[in-house]
Swiss-Prot record:
It comes from the Eukaryota. This is GPI mannosyltransferase 3. GO terms for biological process: GPI anchor biosynthetic process. One of its GO terms (cellular component) is endoplasmic reticulum membrane.
């Protein structure tokens, strides 16, 4: 009897898991999670926020933040609706007291108390929505992406299944493929930690997963199908968000073209060309409209992105990693506990099916994509773990099919006792992986998020200043206040003036941003950019200071122990509270707790 796994139920399972995970996540990973997605969306939805230089320069497409703007807008109108409902209820209570119990002291006290309810309800709902709506949006997107990875695994299984196995438990193997893929994707450490965070790389991986499912893995048999057109549209749209995603599609497209040419299917080749043109037109037109909406003029950010990252040396401003970074660091972190299976998959066929040409084998194509992409990404000077995250669907597919291949090869000869032991311990790594990711998602660097929530809760604030490495905390996407007169932080803009300088490569190592100047000589920076902290009478006559001492001062413990604690002695500042942030940190400047100083009147 067939033991089919209900795929629709799987989507619900993934969705619940990712929603819980997203709602529990309260830590900071990297600045782009907030500053390149939520902050511009907040700026457009609520009319205030801080746009980084990338948005002023036109380097980013607004397609990804637009999703969050839609969520924010719904939240805003939901809050207004609730305010109107509560206001109506308050008015009815007022009418009741005035006409029925006009002499009741308690009634009038209740009316007085309720006057602030509508505004408070609106503020509460709006703030909670601003915090949690993006999390739920990413949870839904993550579930869609991971569900399509499972569908892709099922599709590849059916395509590569040896027909001679039809009567030999193929239904059981089918269920095994789906179940293994579910466990592999849901329990993957980096998926658990990263996929529901509002990074463009998460969005890129999700779109890539969906597009790969609709891709024609027969190398041309289904080129004329609507599913293939959907794959091309999503794929080209993804490239417009992250140009390096083209590394994937150029390789898969190259395989398809080569197979069509070798088999002399010229009509199919012509159909492919037409489909690519149509898909590109749809994607580019859509993206142009979205970016015109944000920027107010026609622009193609992907061209500026390529210019900044490929034709200039300015990307090195954000760090240069060794050539083997992705091999020895990114791959183990992104692939997680399935890394041994991923490596082993390159040394076995993964399928018994014989194809008319080896070039048609989907697993060969996938291995080529992984190998060449890792090489190409390794050639880029600036490297981060998340840059290879779009390859995650390939990592999972190769790991799952390699695990099944090993199970088939050695499972039949293993003893019952061995198989029982294996079935019991096989859950250890997935469970440990999920627990470890949740500990990081709830504890490590939690202070940088908690401090913004705390500042939001303070009723009346005149000014806030952050003396710490730039973009160390979220901004209005978590603070959500436009009633603070001064809200500032130390900056770190790159040397855009070197973009067209032929000597940029030589000058770049000597460029220092504001954060660099701060930590290079803290006391000098304070003297040059801040007035005396003790008395206004000590200010230099006529001198303009970059910053004024704020009512609330936010710093890391490292700066406090190095300088600020002694510097603020006998000043009007007292330590109001502190938040745990990390036990250890790769950046010493961000080590320890986050401390809030309050300047007393």
């Amino acid at each position: 009897m067939s033991n089919q796994v209900p795929l629709k139920r799987l989507f619900k399972v993934i969705l619940v898991i990712r929603c819980v995970q997203a709602l529990l996540t309260r830590t900071f990973f990297q600045a782009d999670e907030f500053w390149q997605s939520l902050e511009p969306a907040h700026y457009m939805a609520f009319g205030y926020g801080e746009l980084t230089w990338e948005w002023s320069f036109g380097l980013r497409s607004y397609a990804f933040p637009l999703i969050f703007q839609i969520g924010y807008t719904l939240v805003k109108y939901a809050a207004i609706s609730c305010e109107l409902i509560v206001q109506t209820a308050t008015d009815w209570v007022l009418l009741f007291v005035a006409n029925v119990i006009p002499n009741s002291e308690f009634g009038w006290e209740m009316v007085q108390e309720m006057r602030s309810f509508p505004e408070e309800i609106r503020g509460f709902i709006e703030y909670q929505g601003v915090i949690y709506a993006p999390k739920l949006i990413m949870a839904v997107l993550a579930a869609i992406g991971e569900f399509h990875v499972i569908l892709l695994a099922e599709k590849l299984y059916k395509l590569t299944m040896d027909k001679s196995d039809d009567s030999k438990g193929s239904d059981k193997k089918h269920s095994t493929v789906i179940n293994f893929t579910l466990v592999a994707t849901v329990s993957n450490f980096f998926n658990c930690f990263f996929i529901t965070r509002s990074f463009i790389n998460s969005f890129e991986m999700i779109l890539t997963s969906v597009s790969l499912y609709y891709w024609d893995w027969t190398s041309g048999e289904h080129i004329e199908s609507f599913d293939f057109l959907k794959s091309l549209i999503i794929g080209t749209f993804t490239v417009l968000q992250r140009p390096t995603n083209a590394f994937i599609w150029l390789i898969l497209g190259g395989y398809m073209i080569l197979n069509l040419v070798l088999s002399k299917r010229w009509r199919k080749l012509f159909s492919l060309l037409i489909k690519v043109i149509c898909a590109s037109f749809i994607s580019i037109s859509t993206n142009l409209c979205i970016d015109y909406y944000f920027y107010g003029y026609i622009t193609i950010p992907v061209l500026k992105f390529i210019k900044f990252n490929c034709t200039s040396s300015l990307s090195k401003f954000y760090g240069v990693a060794p050539w083997n970074f992705h091999v020895f660091q990114s791959l183990p972190i992104v692939a997680g506990y399935s890394l041994p299976l991923l490596i082993h998959s390159f040394f076995c066929s993964l399928t018994k099916k014989r194809f008319l040409s080896p070039l048609v084998n989907p697993f060969l194509q996938i291995k080529t994509v992984v190998l060449l992409n890792v090489i190409l990404y390794s050639l880029i000077p600036h490297k981060e773990f998340r840059f290879i995250y779009p390859l995650q669907p390939f990592f999972i597919i190769l790991s799952v099919f390699d695990g099944i291949w090993l199970l088939q090869k050695y499972g039949s000869t293993a003893t019952t006792r061995t198989m029982e032991f294996f079935s019991q311990v096989m859950w250890i790594l997935p469970v440990v992986s999920m627990v470890a990711s949740m500990l990081l998602s709830t504890l490590h660097e939690s202070g940088t998020v908690a401090v913004m929530d705390y500042l939001h809760s303070i009723r009346n604030i005149d000014s806030i200043g952050f003396i710490m490495p730039c973009h160390s905390t979220p901004w209005q996407s978590h603070f959500h206040r436009n009633d603070v007169k001064e809200l500032w932080a130390i900056t770190c803009s790159p040397p855009l003036h070197l973009l067209t300088d032929p000597d940029a490569n030589a000058k770049l190592p000597f460029y220092m941003d504001e954060s660099d100047y701060l930590y290079d000589n803290i006391s000098k920076f304070m003297y040059q950019h801040f007035p005396p902290v003790f008395r206004k009478s000590l200010r230099s006559p006529g001198k303009q200071y970059t910053y004024e001492w704020p009512e609330y001062l936010v710093i890391f413990e490292d700066l406090d122990s190095q300088f600020m604690n002694d510097y603020l002695v006998d000043s009007m500042y007292i330590e109001e509270t502190r938040f745990f942030n990390s036990l250890v940190h790769w950046d010493k400047r961000r080590s320890g707790d986050i401390i809030i100083y309050h300047k007393m009147p």
